[in-house]
């Protein structure tokens, strides 16, 4: 029976190769990540099990970088009334190095199998145990995170295992109560400002008037949706967004000094290195020099070109031009993808423009000097080119040139764009084989030419890395000679299953969970410009409005998810092979970038690693999902008896968009 079911399933899967590819691309990476989290010693992912818990010293939560080896002693006394009559064993796991003492006698232990700390060791301690009072002490050292211990004693009448009854101390300091290893502890500094709800109450009158004005504009604007006036609104919305962005740049972004921004000092050091030495640094030369060089070379070029005009333009202001134009370019990328997806639906194209123009993470990140906006723009251009290829009746040589150029430049800006390369290759191959019915020789020649162009553009840099370091990809979690960590330094399942802190205390809510981190950095400056204290947050933004956005945006988040589900439905039910291919490609591209963020949080388990703007390369697909979701809600509210709900919906939407803009312009 089971064989027959499996045979039918396999027959259906092989009959639809597109579905097979999508399933493999979705499920395969998930299985890989789960396997790494459970088995790999390079992934500090912890499981409490068998009645024992991982414990740690009660160090206060901090946003500062820690550049030291954590050394902690853990101890517990236990009593033995009589000889247990059987061997006594200690099953021990330590993150990462340990020394074990029973009654202050050192106990020699072999390294875990394959030196994998997750497997732990099992040590017989019977020779050192005596009747009466006994003590067990473990000294744990970890240069890449907090010192953690998991231990249970087997062979006794009662279970003795690590929990909150154990004592802990650092070196010769007094013994204190150990705490459970918890990666969801809040940063106390996040509690130093009012909650989002308190900010909403503070802005109650403003909310009322903006809501009323939004309902009025909806009523007046309904007139423009008779006939074919959507095209006019598309032009008006595009012009309005451009003017709004230009105002933000001239009035706000230009005022942000060189002390504000994510890793800003290191980005500036990279540019300064090129200015002074006229050379590209090695990945090990400084904190941020592991990044590919394109953004820094372009910044160097801008400074050199405008050097005679330094009396008019401040050099630091010039460095803001590339991130700003890239951020505005990301809005264009979303529009360009929307034109392909919604070629016969101007209303949803209008929604794409509005969604893209108001995504908060794109707005605030474009104000800071860094490589992320440029990387997102170039990766977005690659997606634009790809969807145009999928819409075209034939894959041509010039398509491969442009696609290879854009994707090569994106990978030369940041390695994250590399996750799109296999996705693009797989979908190009599917397009040519199953849609265009090309022979394998033609497919191989096109794909080979695309890879050649991309390699010519960016390959030299990665060959240089191989020459110096023995590997092409240098990322901040494996740089030679750099040992550092930040809280929490490890992760548990709870971190990936929790959510809610971003709705109460959004700033630094990234300490609480993966989803709080993404939510707080998508809808606002949840990590306050890379600063470690609320008192040092960027003073150009309006945090009254920004804090209120976090609650107002909760329905919008649901609408984005609804749009993603709608996209999946379109991918499954669309009968046009090119349209099906495009929407599936957008879903998988978004999924790949999001999965890379998840992997990075496993590899680098620090509070600031889960940032929504690492998904900025997928802003085009995100905007399409948003447009699909808002379009579905609009259709639900179309019946005339829902007029009150429609007024409520558009009043809320207008208030949300206004508050988002005032967060940065107010």
Predicted regions and their residues:
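Start-transfer (signal-anchor) and selected internal transmembrane alpha helices
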Residues: 2-37, 202-250, 326, 442-453, ...
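Transmembrane signal-anchor helices characteristic of membrane glycosylation enzymes that use polyprenol
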Residues: 23-42, 230-264, 283, 449-467, ...
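Aromatic-lined ligand-binding clefts that engage carbohydrates, nucleic acids, or primary amines
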Residues: 82-102, 134-140, 175
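Hydrophobic, aromatic-rich transmembrane alpha-helices
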Residues: 215-226, 516, 523-580
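Transmembrane-helix motifs of polytopic, lipid-linked glycan transferases
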Residues: 219-224, 317-342, 381, 562-565
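Perimembrane helix-loop-helix junctions
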Residues: 223-228, 390-391, 420-454
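Transmembrane-helix signature of polytopic, membrane-embedded enzymes
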Residues: 236-239, 313-314, 334-358, 376-377
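Extracytosolic helix-loop segments that constitute the early lumenal/periplasmic catalytic or substrate-binding loops
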Residues: 248, 265-290, 294, 302-307, ...
